[in-house]
C-alpha cells in the first residue's frame, strides 16, 4: 500500500514539473519573439532612413543604403511567414477534437 502512495506522490511531482517546464518554454518563446520583432523594427527604421536619404540626395553610400532596404524587406517577409505559420498552427489546433 505504501508503494501506491509513493507512485501517486511521484506522479504529482512530475505533473508539477511538466507545468513549470511548459511555462518556462512559453516565456522563452515570448522573449525570442519579442527580440525578433525589435530586430525587425530596427531593420525597418534603417531601411526607411536609407530611403529618405536616397530621396533627399543625402545618401553617402548607395550600396549600403540598398543593403539596408533589402534587409528590411527580407526581414518583413520572414516575419510575415512566421505569422502565417503561427496562424495556421493555431487553426489546426482549434480544429483538433479532444
Curated annotation (Swiss-Prot):
GO terms for biological process: bacterial-type flagellum-dependent cell motility. It is found in: Bacterial flagellum basal body. GO terms for cellular component: bacterial-type flagellum basal body. It comes from the Bacteria. The keyword RNA-binding does not apply. The keyword DNA-binding does not apply. Belongs to the FliE family. This is Flagellar hook-basal body complex protein FliE. The gene is fliE.
